[in-house]
Each structure stands twice: as C-alpha cells, then as structure tokens.
Amino acid sequence: VANDHSIAWGVAQALAGQGAELAFTYQGEHYARRVRPLAASVGSEIVMPADVQDAGSLDAVFDRLAADWGKMDFLVHAIAYSDKAQLTGRYADTTRENFLHTMDISCYSFTDLARRAGALMRSGGAMVTMTYLGAQRVMPNYNAMGVAKAALEASVRYLANDFGPDGIRVNAISPGPMRTLAGSAIGGARKVYKVCAENAPMRQNATLDDVGGAAVYLLSDLGRGTTGEVVFVDSG
C-alpha cells in the first residue's frame, strides 16, 4: 500500500469489510507514516517494510507472518515500477538496466512472493496481482511496463498450474485507468481518464471499490472455480 488512493488500499478496505484479517507492507519509511494509520483503521497490527529486491527483507516479512498467523489464506500483489523517463518515447530505446529493473520489481516479485506465500497456504488459498491493458495492447507512454505486465499475466497462468494441485488459485485483475500514484506516472494520464470515461460502455471509469469487489470475489470461496485468469474491471 502506498496511500489511501492506491489500488491496494481499495482492495484492503473491501477485504476488511468482509472480516478479513490483514497484514500490510510498505516500501521505505517515506510511506510508513501513510500506511500505518490506514492499517490501524481496519484493525491490522502487522505493518512491515518490504523490499522485493532484498531476500532478507522478504524473509523477515514471512517469518513474522508464520510466527503470528501460522498460515495464510490469500496474497495481494500490487507492486510495479519503471523509470518514468523511459515510459515515454520508443520502447526500443529502453535501456537494459531499466528493462531488467522493471521486470524484477513488476513481474518476478510476484513469483517470489507467491512461492513464499504458497508455503503458508496449507489449507488452500488464493493469490491476486494487478495488471493493465498495456500488457495485451500497445499503450502510449507504457513501454517496458507493458512488457513486464505481459510477463506478469503469463506468470499468473504458470503459477495457477503450479499451485492448483494444492488448492491455491492465482488470478490477475486488470483495472481501467485510475487516479493513483502509479497512474500519475504515465504521460497523458488525464486525457486517458477522460477518453476512457467517454467511451466505456458504462460511460465511467472503474473505481477502487469496483476493484476491491473483484478482489473479494477472487480471493474468497465465491471465486473457487476461477484460476489462471485476467479479470478486467474497467467499465467495459
């Protein structure tokens, strides 16, 4: 969770509303002062820093979860990053450094977290990650992030196959354009919001509540027959 406008927070609110017990992670102390009050507002006492590029940091997170809970029922992955300066211009000009960094944080982190969380889902469970239409179509100002999201969607299918025998489902939610911290990094975001709202069948953009509702379905027994899928929540 980054702040109260993040997709992860919308999901957390929806899950808490259904009685889920939650743990929160954040990236660095800069975000801690925003996340701790949010976690407290839904009764969560587990709030930890997590650096997905640091195995030791993730070890600490999952050691704490194992000690406090003993098991997990679900995982929500809502992490992505690419150099903002390289989201514009030609994808062909993306540097090797930025490509690998983008793939590591935006894609591989889900596989790493899924493996760790799966070990704690002893009675089955569910996992959800967040993707975007730029994974399936060329979108302006998305570049390496689109490639990383495409790899993330493929990861969902492979992970669903890996964990299916253990009763663990793995899916992705693909929200439409949203006014989030991550969304603001995309060039021309305001125009995208406006055009999508004008042209979507429902004539509006999806909300955090909409995404949260989809997550509740996928992470609960309501979605017990759904795995390996990308669920669009974008007003059509």
Task: Outline where the language-model segments fall.
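Canonical Rossmann dinucleotide-binding motif of NAD(H)/NADP(H)-dependent dehydrogenases/reductases
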Residues: 1-23
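Catalytic loop of short-chain dehydrogenase/reductase
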Residues: 1-7, 80-111, 115, 119, ...
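Conserved glycine-rich Rossmann-like NAD(P)H-binding loop of the short-chain dehydrogenase/reductase
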Residues: 19-36
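Rossmann-fold cofactor-recognition segment
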Residues: 39-56
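Short, small/polar-rich loop/turn modules that mediate ligand/substrate recognition or access, typified
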Residues: 164, 169, 226-228
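Short, flexible catalytic-loop segment of classical short-chain dehydrogenase/reductase
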Residues: 170, 174-185
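A conserved structural motif in NAD(P)-dependent oxidoreductases
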Residues: 200-211, 222
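Short-chain dehydrogenase/reductase
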Residues: 224-236
